[in-house]
A protein has these predicted regions:
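Extended, low-complexity cationic-aromatic segments
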Residues: 1-87, 193, 197-199
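Acidic, metal-coordinating catalytic cores used for nucleic-acid/nucleotide bond scission
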Residues: 77-78, 101-112, 131-136, 161
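RNase H-like polynucleotidyl transferase catalytic core
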Residues: 44-50, 118-138, 154-156
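Short coil/turn segments at beta-strand junctions that form active-site/ligand-binding loops
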Residues: 14-15, 96-98
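Active-site proximal helix-loop segment of RNase H-like, two-metal nucleases, encompassing DDE(D)
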Residues: 69, 139-161, 172-174
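C-terminal domain-tail junction helix/linker
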Residues: 161-213
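Short beta-strand segments
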Residues: 18-20, 99-103, 127-130, 183-184
Length: 213
């Protein structure tokens, strides 16, 4: 946790810090009936019944200083797709500038093929957040914006419709990117975790995450 927060509070010079994660199994949902639009005196409504038309997984990297996001959708979220995304980042940031990647310790990120690729590309430096601490990864905040504004109330008749909505949101965001500013120190976070543990013992213990290779 210390090194991740250190990157946020004091980013290294002559290097880039990217918060990386995948939003997996995003569903393309089509409502069975049209919703009623928002109007004066009445909230917009939509049916709770829906049809599923498949899923996609979004890999995204948030550059913390400018707030720009690089994202790509894939059908699955195995180590093969993660490697493709790493190659995309390698092209997106050409040259030899060091790239510090903040991510969780999901098994896909530690696959042998990924480790071998990283050995051949030493400018990629990985920083893993502690288990069950995805809130430390700033790209999760961006995922929240994406979900609220482009996915949650959307109507998607195909996976392609869903991907088009995600890509449109990405394009609009990057025209006027907004960085997420981190202010909490390690000491303040540690104190809050101690307080939570006193209130609800065991609530800060790591939880296992299903692995996908």
């Amino acid at each position: 946790m210390t090194d991740v927060i250190g990157l946020y509070l004091n980013p290294p010079q002559q290097a880039m810090v990217l918060c990386v994660d995948e939003k997996s199994q995003i569903q393309a949902l089509d409502r069975t009936q049209p919703g009623l639009p928002l109007k004066k005196g009445r909230c917009g409504t939509m049916t709770h019944d829906y049809k599923r038309h498949g899923t996609t997984t979004l890999f995204a990297a948030l550059e913390i200083l400018q707030g720009k996001v690089i994202g790509q959708c894939y059908q699955r979220h195995r180590h093969q797709e993660f490697l493709k995304f790493l190659r995309t980042l390698d092209k997106e940031f050409p040259g030899q500038v060091p790239l510090h990647l903040v991510m969780d310790n999901y098994g896909t990120h530690k696959h042998e093929n990924v480790r071998n690729w990283l050995k051949r590309h030493p400018r990629f430096v990985l920083h893993f957040v502690p288990t069950s601490s995805s809130w430390l990864n700033l790209v999760e905040r961006w995922f929240g914006h994406l979900d609220q504004k482009a996915i949650r109330r959307g109507v998607f008749r195909s996976v392609e419709d869903l991907k088009a909505s995600i890509e449109a949101f990405l394009t609009a965001w990057n025209k006027d990117p907004k960085p997420f500013v981190w202010t909490a120190t390690v000491e303040s976070i540690t104190e809050k975790l101690r307080t939570l543990e006193k209130i609800q013992p065991g609530c800060t213990s790591p939880r296992r995450r299903k692995r996908t290779t």
